[in-house]
Amino acid sequence: MLKDPCALIVRKETWGEFCLLALHSPKIARQAAPGQFLMVKVGNESYPLLRRPFSIHSRDRNRVEIFFTKAGAGTAILASRNPGEALDIIGPLGKGFRLGRTKATGRTAFLVGGGRGIAPIYFLARELRSRGVQTRIFYGGRTESHLPLLPKLVEQGFDIFVSTDDGSLGFHGFVCPMLERELARLLNTPRRRRSRTVRRPEIFACGPDAMMKGVAEIAARYRVRAQFSLESIMGCGIGACWGCVKKIKRAGRAGWVKICEEGPVFKDTEIVWEEA
């Protein structure tokens, strides 16, 4: 974990309520891994008092990017900041996606991003592809305008499946039925049925709780592993305030853990999903 009080905004993109900021912070960029997050002081004054958590959307040698929606006073202030201004950030924080060190031969990953949940999925997709993993991205939103990163994903050649709640683009409906259809199609190919050595795909997801609960049910039904990046309000991001607890089950026992410290990424078998 590092603190950079002068992370310079070097690029800004906006699409309605969505915003992307690229920050020059070489030390943090070099340490960042998919699924980790930053705690950002959004303004220069004492208000808002608390930092805001943001998934790391991408990184290169010198920069990290965050992608977010203007959902309240804090994110509205952050979205008003411009290139040339500096932000006070802390990171990278949390435990990211567990990718392992095994060879990528035969591996397939299904990545599911709902709305702003696409933020960490993009970083993960680039990392998996660099390792030779066959990557499929399932990107869902309320309407076509809520899929602002789609052109970038298409341009970079990812295998993408799109859904919108209103049917304005792609599959008409939620992302889960589309995910299940493609998962069943993959697992039922003759080669998959014959082979005992080809690995089953793994699912990685981030988005609304209802979506992720649905993805978890699909993963259990098809006996595939899954990891989920949970979103939560956070007061500190370092485990001091207990403001981001989630019930997690390990070794047959459920208990409350801090998302910022133990997560934000958890295995599907660990999460105790609340009733919708």
Where are these regions (language model features)?
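Short microdomains enriched in Cys/His and/or Lys/Arg
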Residues: 258-276
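Local cysteine-cluster metal-coordination motifs and their immediate loop/turn environment
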Residues: 209-210, 231-264
